Amino acid sequence: MISMFFHLLRAAIGTGPCYRRPLTSDEWRALYRVCVVQGVTVVVFDFVKTLPKSEAPELALLMEWLSAATAVEQTMRRMQITAEEFAEEMEKREIPMVVLKGLAFAQYYKNPLHRECGDLDCYMMGKKEAGDLAALELGGRMEEAGYKHSHLQYKGLTIENHRFFTDFDNTRRGILTERLLGELIREEQTPMGGSKLLCPSANFNALFLLKHAQGHFIDEGIRMRHVLDWALLLKQVQDGIDWPRLLEMLERTRTARFAGVMTAIAVRYLG
């Protein structure tokens, strides 16, 4: 069953053919549950919906899958629209809004709306407090969520407004990681489409993705969505990464071994 899951996922992202054998209703139901748990419901459905009727899931499951995929896409579209509106308001106040994590990594997907995420993470280039105040002026709500970030509520969108990038707990390695990420994010940001949202460089996203996934792995484990983020980043922008510099940073932040494991999994299972 897990083997078939990876066949479907590779076919969905265009890195391999799907081994096509007839699946029972129970097998399809199990595959669907795996996709939901691993955070790739919509990505895999993009391929499943192209299967001929003789190979596709039964209609009841197909409609359930379609409903779940549509709900994710609609949620992500609302998030994108509201985030762009909020970024425009920040731009009027000369507050840059650089997106982190989900919305940034989504740019590496064939359809960015198919990368699932629950809220918007952003970094305002040292103007966090001004951004918090602006959100309140715009009728939103704000609450501090520890030293790392605040939670903003704006027109139904939850925004994590970051003061720091990681839960570094004032450790020597954590302070170094923050400093390196700060250097990278200041070097380059590019507009996302025609919006005022800014996306960090490939160098920043690579280091941040790996540190973020490593944190999840240590705390509660990671899902295939994290590995897929890394695989698609490599597929889309590996030529734009300063590899000698990044590898040095990974060594200094003790992320190199984890990066190697993530890459090995991505290559072996996602092509």
Whereabouts are the PLM-identified features?
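Conserved NTP-donor binding/palm subdomain of two-metal-ion nucleotidyltransferases/polymerases, i.e.
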Residues: M1-G118, M124-G271
